[in-house]
UniProtKB/Swiss-Prot annotation:
InterPro entries in UniProt: Cytidylyl_trans, KdsB, Nucleotide-diphossugar_trans
Function (record text): Activates KDO (a required 8-carbon sugar) for incorporation into bacterial lipopolysaccharide in Gram-negative bacteria.
Pathway: Nucleotide-sugar biosynthesis; CMP-3-deoxy-D-manno-octulosonate biosynthesis; CMP-3-deoxy-D-manno-octulosonate from 3-deoxy-D-manno-octulosonate and CTP: step 1/1; Bacterial outer membrane biogenesis; lipopolysaccharide biosynthesis
Keywords annotated in UniProt: Cytoplasm, Lipopolysaccharide biosynthesis, Nucleotidyltransferase, Transferase
Gene Ontology biological process terms from the UniProt entry: CMP-keto-3-deoxy-D-manno-octulosonic acid biosynthetic process; lipopolysaccharide biosynthetic process
A molecular function (GO) term: 3-deoxy-manno-octulosonate cytidylyltransferase activity
Protein name in the entry: 3-deoxy-manno-octulosonate cytidylyltransferase
Superkingdom of this protein's organism: Bacteria
EC id: 2.7.7.38
Catalytic activity: 3-deoxy-alpha-D-manno-oct-2-ulosonate + CTP = CMP-3-deoxy-beta-D-manno-octulosonate + diphosphate
Length: 250
């Protein structure tokens, strides 16, 4: 099975400016992500960025890069520009690998692509079990609930499903029904072309979760438990410091 990995890498991060170029163990962060994607067995790995300095860094590392417009509102829009510029066929499987996940396990990049290939869903993603009440009630940890066939019913920043009897007594413990969504996606190129033409939905604007647009328009999202749990992504300086420490200890 063939798939292409595209890594959106926006330069102007609000909390960590120049994030794709942040040095981790002697390499820019985006290069670490690119190397993980290459290890996944992707037939092609493309970094999609809005900044010439990122282009220079990726090319210096021997990678493939596409300089996109700077006005995209999401990584999916940036990915869609790459799909159009390369002219990928509608049935080509694309994996959207977040540019701020330098420790992403290569096996889950391949896993989400294989899951999509075996499904009729327009999109596939992954999740991991939540084991603490702190994480279940953390709005930055996105929860997902699925149906019997493994398709997403809903994504939320709230604690879903709500354990009525348990939580009526205490919120200190949780059951084994909670899943945290991982922000890695696989789609067919034709699906992305349709997605970017849909108007944003009310639910995604309330929750600030872009994937809810897919459910709003009646499309399916396949969800599976990830074969490996990703380490911390990089949103803040504290995250970057943690990742640097992990890489130094490897």
């Amino acid at each position: 099975m063939s798939f292409i990995a595209i890594i959106p890498a926006r330069y102007a991060s609000t909390r960590l400016p120049g994030k794709p170029l942040a040095d981790i163990a002697g390499k820019p962060m985006v290069v670490h992500v690119m190397e993980r994607a290459l290890e996944s067995g992707a037939s092609q790995v493309i970094v999609a960025t809005d900044h010439p300095e990122v282009v220079t860094a990726v090319e210096a590392a021997g990678g493939e890069v596409c300089l996109t417009r700077a006005d995209h509102q999401s990584g999916t829009e940036r990915l869609a520009e790459v799909i159009e510029r390369y002219g990928f066929a509608d049935d080509q499987i694309i994996v959207n690998v977040q540019g701020d996940e330098p420790l992403v396990p290569p096996e889950i990049i391949r896993q989400v692509a294989e899951n999509l290939a075996a499904s009729s869903a327009g999109m596939a993603t992954l999740a991991v079990p939540i084991e603490s009440s702190e994480e279940a009630f953390n709005p930055n940890a996105v929860k997902v609930v699925m149906d019997a066939q493994g398709y997403a019913l809903y994504f939320s920043r709230a604690a879903i499903p709500w354990e009525r009897e348990r939580f009526a007594q205490s919120k200190e413990t949780i059951g084994d029904c909670f899943l945290r969504h991982i922000g890695i996606y696989a789609y067919r190129a034709g699906f992305v072309r349709r997605y970017v033409n849909w108007a944003p939905s009310q639910l995604e604007q309330i929750e600030l979760l872009e994937q809810l647009r897919v459910l709003w328009y009646g499309e399916k999202i396949h969800v599976a438990v990830a074969k490996a749990v990703p380490a911390v992504g990089v949103d803040t300086q504290e995250d970057l410091d943690r990742v640097r420490a992990i890489m130094l200890n490897k």
